[in-house]
């Protein structure tokens, strides 16, 4: 049985002049106005990386737990604030190169937290030093245009953006 993870991908539509909440019928074909909320992974491995070092807020869950409940829990743990109340659309399941299966839920929301305060994880660093340090799972999170997010997200999550673009284009 593969390791399972669930996450939330928030998105918003921004008009070319930067005004949020533009109508889909005024969106350009390229979806330049589509922005997504993604998070930079924490810890020393990711500290100086930017390209393909960002992720959809997500986390593992166990058999018997509902994926949306897990996604909401993980979002709150990683952002330090609950996910916004919304009608979350199941965007799909996406197999990662590691074999992990991620279930992603999407919602159109303008999420603007005052701060990001992630939970932490212990790690011996430097390796072999015997020193256990605690690092945030997430050290930054923000909105990116969909085209820029493609350069930031870990490569295994790029199909999630493809699914979101298909959804936004199809949604009346």
Please describe what each predicted stretch is:
Residues 48, 64, 152:
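Residues that scaffold the ATP/ADP-binding catalytic core of kinase and kinase-like folds
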Residues 14-17, 43-46, 62-63, 98-99, ...:
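Short, charged/polar surface micro-motifs in flexible loops or helix N-caps
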Residues 117-159:
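NUDIX/MutT-family hydrolases
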Residues 55-91, 105, 145:
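The catalytic Nudix box helix
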Residues 1-56, 105:
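N-terminal strand-loop-strand
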Residues 14-17, 166-172:
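Generic C-terminal helix-cap and adjacent flexible tail
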Residues 93-130, 142, 164, 171:
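Active-site-adjacent beta-strand/loop module that shapes the phosphate/pyrophosphate-binding cleft
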